[in-house]
Curated annotation (Swiss-Prot):
Pathway: Nitrogen metabolism; nitric oxide reduction. The modification 4-aspartylphosphate is found at residue 57. The gene is norR. Keywords: ATP-binding, DNA-binding, Nucleotide-binding, Phosphoprotein, Transcription, Transcription regulation. GO terms for biological process: phosphorelay signal transduction system. This is Anaerobic nitric oxide reductase transcription regulator NorR. Residues 187-416 form the Sigma-54 factor interaction domain. The lineage of its organism: Bacteria, Pseudomonadati, Pseudomonadota, Gammaproteobacteria, Enterobacterales. ATP binds at residues 215-222, 278-287. It comes from the Bacteria. InterPro entries: AAA+_ATPase (IPR003593), GAF (IPR003018), GAF-like_dom_sf (IPR029016), Homeodomain-like_sf (IPR009057), NorR (IPR023944), P-loop_NTPase (IPR027417), Sigma_54_int (IPR002078), Sigma_54_int_dom_ATP-bd_1 (IPR025662).
Amino acid sequence: MSFSVDELARIAIDLQSDIGHTDRFSRLITTLRQILGCDASALLRYEAHQFVPLAIDGLAQDVLGRRFALEGHPRLEAIARAGDVVRFPADSDLPDPYDGLIPGHESLKVHACVGLPLFAGQTLIGALTLDGMDADRFDSFSDEELRLIAALVAGALNNALLIARLEAQNVLPAQAVNYPLPERQEIIGLSGPMLQLKKEIDIVAASDLNVLISGETGTGKELVAKAVHQGSPRAANPLVYLNCAALPESVAESELFGHVKGAFTGAISNRSGKFEMADNGTLFLDEIGELSLALQAKLLRVLQYGDIQRVGDDRSLRVDVRVLAATNRDLRQEVVEGRFRADLYHRLSVFPLSVPPLRERESDVVLLAGYFCEQCRLRMGLARVILAEAARNRLQQWSWPGNVRELEHAIHRAVVLARATQAGDEVVLEPQHFQFAVAAPMLPTETAAAAPATGNINLREATDSFQREAISRALEANQGNWAATARALELDVANLHRLAKRLGLKGSPPGKSSAG
């Protein structure tokens, strides 16, 4: 044998360590890299025609955030289809998914590559990949030895997946376990705040409580709502979405509750509202803080009694709907200031979820960047999208006032810029491809600096200052045209006028001017 009994014992000990699965697999991958003398190794979980990295060693950190779709990675597809050890020759025409992703060797191609598919019975559950810069790196190891390693790792991975499934079933009502659940919405992040959020999602998802999801714009509140729905007994039923900020007051009640024919001008037929569409499922009300007090009262009645009335109809309809609401406002302060009903707030916030801003989960920036790089690679038909080390450092130094959405847009823009200046189907993202609004990273943004100069500024004042600055800039960029400004900010123009008036940007309700 090319490795000793002691080395096998090290592998077995790593697999049986009394630590969490993530740490156990990381230790295992490090041990395998040392024993086999490879330059990089990775443990991947197989799901939905893609491989998801669980642990890596010797690879760039952003690999943990990448999702390797089989159709875009021929070598991984070959490993998935094989029932045994796969050795790729040094002159293989198939591109290696890790080319350019080994620190210190970004400009070199991986030469030696071995793939070990991992099975539970006849079911593919993952893969172990071993890469080396030397063409003969793994020649001294027989297929039998590699199969032994694969069997040990597959057993540990299968146990971890079974435990995770049992834990998920344990928090669901017994009757829900019998139904096939859709694929869970993945939330990228391994930082402490995100691991805590994922735990809270698992806990509240299994209940039927209404949930208030709070967080800054761009943090991923809709993603959290999807995860709650998909982890609930209602997962097989509809998840209906409604953006309250884009809802004109004149049609808001009809959108929520529906209307009957003739209820108002233009009501030419009966129409179901969002509550009816979500019956037996979940209704996600985004930006709920934008609802008028009158609509808040009607929403409260639905939550209290479970019935609705279509506009123009005297009859009540029973609905069974779980409500998930999201806001970027401090609703407690809104209650104090009389803009949000206290009773509705308490109905919604029995189990609140708070989505942390990206600046509070700094270690997730590179993972998310890797995820978006891989998305761009697939969409644009590129062989590789590589994040240079200097670019990774720059991303980690930025404060991300726009959160995950800003990072996503920054990656997409950088890929387009890099592709325009680099030949071939491989792009390398460098610091110059990322252009941020403020030169000094990790410092208060211009918007924050424009806030009232007082040491006692609260979240409400900071939010108002940010919104006031954003609207002012957009209005200036659109030459004072309110309709164009509303489109740029993705808001309903009537809601924008109301918000601008509240923020002191307008002295009176809008008239019918040429500016819209």
